Amino acid sequence: MHDKFISREQAQGDLLSAAAFLAENIRSADGHAEAMNVIVPLYLAKGDVDLAAELSNQIAEPFARDKLLMQIAEKCAELDDDEYAVQLADAIEEHGLRAQAIEHVAQVKAAKGQI
């Protein structure tokens, strides 16, 4: 079993934390991945890339996990956390998605004139 990142107390504090708490406790691998595919982008919108990455790493299904890690890497590049963006891209298992993540990071940096 994986670690829980949202406590019951946190879940009582706001709706997104409650949703994440419930999603962390879904036992079906497919159900867990589907729930996190909705929740992680909401944490990204708030700029909470660390929690988004931790929640994504819990996903057992590699393709779903890799797709979310790609989104998080791109968000890190937008936030100028380039080292973390590269680290997340490197953590992607599927070679094609890893290359796509690196491309997205590079596109963000190029658009900002930082390459």
Question: What are the residue ranges of the model-derived segments?
Answer:
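Non-catalytic tandem-repeat scaffold regions and their flanking low-complexity/translocation tails
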Residues: 1-115
